[in-house]
């Protein structure tokens, strides 16, 4: 708290007068950015995959949802960098749990619909999807926490993320038994 107060040009007492602790302060600071991500993941859960055509359903896999979400974070990069560098783990852990559960729910609904329609020949367990969602979340956090990205995502880190997401995409195609569709647009820069 002293370091944060010094950077803000105030006394630690001023912070403690307003917030009961660092976690309370982080919750207040990140409320808007966190809510933006939560609203996005909640809206994804409302997607009605049953009303989509087969082509529309397959296009979801190649739409770059994760990449667009990652780009959404760029406006708040300094805040997220500060959170990852200074949080004792409580706020981030709580956020991570909720966000990953929502992403896992979305993915399970999606993969289930692919399988029901015969567009995928295999199903993934919920535990596998949870681990994949956790891995993706960890990749994003790793990039944000990198000191080279504290003022924005560097081209090198963005390219590394795009490549990692393409590897994940092709792994999902193989694991689900989906024949390769046209090359995703987000992998070409």
Where are the model-predicted features located?
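Amphipathic alpha-helical packing segments from all-alpha helical-bundle domains
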Residues: 71-75, 89-117, 127-134
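Helix-turn-helix
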Residues: 1-24, 28
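Hydrophobic/aromatic-rich alpha-helical bundle segments in the mid-to-C-terminal region
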Residues: 114-167, 175-189
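Secondary-structure edge/capping motif, primarily at the C-terminal ends of alpha-helices
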Residues: 44-52, 80-87, 114, 143-151, ...
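Short, basic, alpha-helical segments at the C-terminal edge of helix-turn-helix-like DNA-binding modules
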Residues: 1, 31-38, 42-45
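C-terminal/domain-terminus segments
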Residues: 83-100, 156-175
């Amino acid at each position: 708290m002293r370091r944060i107060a010094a950077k803000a040009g105030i006394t630690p007492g001023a912070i403690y007068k307003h917030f009961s602790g660092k976690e309370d302060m982080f919750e207040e600071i990140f409320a808007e950015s966190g809510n933006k991500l939560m609203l996005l993941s909640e809206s994804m859960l409302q997607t009605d995959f049953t009303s989509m055509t087969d082509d529309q359903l397959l296009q979801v896999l190649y739409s770059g949802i994760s990449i667009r979400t990652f780009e959404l974070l760029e406006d708040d990069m300094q805040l997220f960098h500060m959170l990852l560098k200074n949080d004792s783990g409580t706020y981030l852990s709580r956020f991570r749990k909720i966000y990953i559960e929502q992403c896992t729910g979305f993915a399970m609904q999606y993969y289930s619909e692919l399988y029901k329609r015969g567009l995928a020949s295999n199903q993934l367990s919920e535990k596998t999807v949870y681990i994949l969602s956790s891995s993706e979340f960890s990749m994003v956090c790793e990039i944000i926490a990198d000191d080279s990205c504290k003022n924005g995502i560097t081209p090198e880190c963005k390219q590394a993320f795009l490549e990692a997401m393409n590897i994940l995409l092709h792994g999902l195609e193989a694991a689900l038994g989906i024949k390769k569709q046209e090359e995703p647009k987000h992998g070409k820069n």
